Amino acid sequence: MSITKDQIIEAVAAMSVMDVVELISAMEEKFGVSAAAAVAVAAGPVEAAEEKTEFDVILKAAGANKVAVIKAVRGATGLGLKEAKDLVESAPAALKEGVSKDDAEALKKSLEEAGAEVEVK
């Protein structure tokens, strides 16, 4: 009769911490492995999160002072009055795409000062 995995798990669960430590040591000796190495291999190499370099500036809402927002959009995008007005009225809309973080933050600040609700993605 062979022992199932569930029976092994139940047996280990019933052991004290010291018994489990002794079991691990015995398994390391028997199979010539190290539990610490297995944990490191299982975790894998940790890669640093790649920092985003391009951002999109999204106008979510014009706010109460639509005229000031239209002026700010015109200044930032170089659009004509009608195009800027249409863009502001069609919010949420992308104002600029693929800009640097500094440019995106500066644009966001100027639009928020004009009263707009802006998101940088």
Curated annotation (Swiss-Prot):
One of its GO terms (biological process) is translation. The keyword Disulfide bond does not apply. One of its GO terms (molecular function) is structural constituent of ribosome. Keywords: Ribonucleoprotein, Ribosomal protein. Belongs to the bacterial ribosomal protein bL12 family. Forms part of the ribosomal stalk which helps the ribosome interact with GTP-bound translation factors. Is thus essential for accurate translation. Homodimer. Part of the ribosomal stalk of the 50S ribosomal subunit. Forms a multimeric L10(L12)X complex, where L10 forms an elongated spine to which 2 to 4 L12 dimers bind in a sequential fashion. Binds GTP-bound translation factors. GO terms for cellular component: cytosolic large ribosomal subunit. This is Large ribosomal subunit protein bL12. It comes from Shigella sonnei (strain Ss046).
